[in-house]
Curated annotation (Swiss-Prot):
The gene is rpsC. CDD domains: KH-II_30S_S3. This is Small ribosomal subunit protein uS3. Belongs to the universal ribosomal protein uS3 family. Binds the lower part of the 30S subunit head. Binds mRNA in the 70S ribosome, positioning it for translation. Keywords: Ribonucleoprotein, Ribosomal protein, RNA-binding, rRNA-binding. InterPro entries: KH_dom (IPR004087), KH_dom-like_a/b (IPR015946), KH_dom_type_2 (IPR004044), KH_sf_prok-type (IPR009019), Ribosomal_S3_C_sf (IPR036419), Ribosomal_uS3_bac-typ (IPR005704), Ribosomal_uS3_C (IPR001351), Ribosomal_uS3_CS (IPR018280). The lineage of its organism: Bacteria, Pseudomonadati, Pseudomonadota, Alphaproteobacteria, Hyphomicrobiales.
Amino acid sequence: MGQKINPIGLRLGINRTWDSRWYANTGEYGKLLHEDVKIREFLTEELKQAAISKIVIERPHKKCRVTIHSARPGIIIGKKGADIEKLRKKLSEMTNADTSLNIVEVRKPEIDATLIAQSIAQQLERRVAFRRAMKRAVQSAMRLGAEGIRINCSGRLGGAEIARMEWYREGRVPLHTLRADIDYGTAEAKTAYGICGVKVWVFKGEILEHDPMASERRAVEGDNQGSSSNRRRENA
């Protein structure tokens, strides 16, 4: 089962939490769910260059709070915050609610599964050899603290007549272990020969406590430790 299912969906409520966090009446649920899909599609299209990892949507009473996790927050914010204000106004019009927009920087894009998949897809579109792109991504992830990584590329790789699937793995990726903190991401490369799919699994260690927010808290703590160690180096 762990080999087939989306690893994030399998761990929801155990050591992962949902990206849409709100409750609704039966009559409103469908409308709000459709709104979430539209918000994500709009932001993904609008901020293609911003390296977006994930979009979290929360809905306090008659409000909407959107949190964008991005490796390039400067592109979203713009000069003196002009771009982020335009985005906020567009989102308010889409939701018909008072919308706030938060940006969270992804400090280690090399171990974020979605960003790795996007990077490989962009390289395939630029005709970089798929094996080289995969190997480079694996080496970067292992160097920056991942305990294991697996990458699948499928489609007409290198312009081959027959589509196939190639994969590369290093370290451990225990898909069946529920306490494993596994990040998963996908991307599509639109090449001259057709679409190639990229899937990435990153194993970041084990979470022993039963806490749906554990994975997020761990990422934030890791960022803080990284920034404090950088400050210590600068002071030295």
